[in-house]
Amino acid sequence: MDFQQLADVADKWCSNTPFDLIATEETERRMDFYADPGVSFYVLCPESGCGDHFHVWSESEDCLPFLQLAQDYISSCGKKTLHEILEKVFKSFRPLLGLPDVDDDTFEEYNADVEEEEPEADHQQMGVSQQ
């Protein structure tokens, strides 16, 4: 995919997130993204036909630790699309953006299941107190 097509994918992705595509540099194949409050990162795109992977990084030391999930995802086996990588970055930055974690729903469902099992837990406590 040529760089302009990748930039179009990134621009479309931005329309559904708090991020803006603030700069593109075709010679470096670099795209810079920014969202309030000061969350920024950039993506280096591989050359067309090259076996290289995408690369994500941030020049902000506050943002950098949050990119670990996306960096691990990129380095895992298999070819990734720009959209998949941007989605991972968005998920990584949700806490910095003040958005709920995507996995919170799963956790709440798990807690709901645990609450249903409370009578069983009471029974175990009774068994312990009898000893």
UniProtKB/Swiss-Prot annotation:
Disruption phenotype: Morpholino knockdown of the protein causes an accumulation of neuronal progenitor cells resulting in the neural plate expansion. PANTHER family: MATURIN (PTHR32008:SF2). Residues 107-120 have a biased composition (Acidic residues). Involved in early neuronal development; required for cell cycle exit and differentiation of primary neurons. Cooperates synergistically with pak3 to promote primary neural differentiation within the neural plate. May play a role in promoting megakaryocyte differentiation. GO terms for cellular component: cytoplasm. Signal peptide: none annotated. This is Maturin. Pfam families: DUF4581. Belongs to the MTURN family. GO terms for biological process: negative regulation of neuroblast proliferation; neural plate formation; neuron development; positive regulation of megakaryocyte differentiation; positive regulation of neuron differentiation; regulation of cell cycle; regulation of signaling. The keyword Transmembrane helix does not apply. Residues 107-131 are annotated as: Disordered. Coiled coil: none annotated. InterPro entries: Maturin. It is found in: Cytoplasm. Keywords: Cell cycle, Cytoplasm, Developmental protein, Differentiation, Growth arrest. It comes from the Eukaryota.
